Amino acid sequence: MQTITVPLGERSYPIHIERGLLAKTGEMIREKLGDIAVAVVSDDHVAPLYMEEVVSSMEKVGLRVCSIVLPHGEQTKCLKSLETLYAFLCEHHLTRKDAIVALGGGVIGDLAGLPAATSLRGVHFVQLPTTLLAQVDSSVGGKVAVDLPQGKNLVGAFYQPELVLVDPDSLRTLTDDFWRDGLGEVVKYGCIGDEALFRLLEENAGGGRTALMGVIGEILTHCIQYKANIVAQDEHDTGLRMTLNFGHTIAHAVETCQHYTGMRHGEAVALGMRVITAMTEEKGMTEQGTSARLNRLLDALGMPRRLPAIPEKDLLNAMTLDKKSAGKQLRVITLDKIGVCRIVPTDVDFFQGMTAQKFVQN
């Protein structure tokens, strides 16, 4: 078992990585939190695959377990689902010494974490991420949130889990679209600060998913360790942590305009990275050839190349609600080159012309 620690003083927590780890969930939780009750939150994609195994492991060590299964998809990450979870927790009389366990991808982790942060002013929280996106990104760092019709992740909190269990075997059941969903975030890490990861992806992308699964341990370690280091330095997203949002300004605007029913988040991030890098390279802000190198990798990974047919004015309007904004100022993450990024203060006018064909297909 490999363990990466997110170092946050008294709130530090371990991220354990091991094949077959879901079967040890009960043992790991009891060792960390003692004799408690556990509410498992999952969705109707993940529950049929892993709920029985996880609940059985908990009951085997004497934990008291209740569970709830929600519809899958980004549309579930809403205030109505939050209300459903609050009612469920009250119905089962969870106390402050008990735990909410998120079993699923980024939507379930983000959603389940908010009642963990706020029910009874905070209960224990455990993440069991089963998608690539959740394992490398959303389960690490304590961001929990739901969406509003006006934008993504607009109601949320910073609430660190006490334990994260990453089982790479769960990635074998991902459909191709969920696999690409995670790859968008993986490429992001290589772009902003880990060129060794970027090269690892370049070396293996041609072999498809099989080749990437052959080095999945290295990929997970690169991503999780990088994010843990960033979170340790900037837990509340006021500076350095903003760099993790490379590609996300455009991505969130696309998702908002599509009402979270279009492409997967990681696919939208890939488009955002393509567009912003093409634009900054043309402006002389990014080393020549960076955009082409990024596009070659994203193409090899099967990521989308074209922005959806959304009016540019709608995308620009959605950007005004971006969480990285400060007043009318928008903070955009750009690349100097692969592996080196910066935060650029600007405004939405920076993105004028982003839907031009030269920026969305090279």
Label every PLM stretch briefly:
Residues 7, 93-95, 118-120, 147-148, ...:
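Solvent-exposed alpha-helices and their adjacent loops that cap or buttress functional pockets
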Residues 107-114, 135-136, 253:
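Short glycine/serine/threonine-rich phosphate/pyrophosphate-binding segments
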Residues 2, 184-186, 285-362:
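C-terminal charged capping/lid subdomain of soluble metabolic enzymes
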Residues 66-68, 101, 126-128, 163-166, ...:
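Hydrophobic/aromatic beta-strand patches that form the interior of the parallel beta-sheet core
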Residues 1-99:
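ATP/NTP phosphate-donor binding region
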Residues 199-313:
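Active-site segments that bind and position negatively charged phosphate/pyrophosphate groups
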Residues 16, 114-206:
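A glycine/threonine-rich phosphate-anchoring loop and its flanking beta-alpha core
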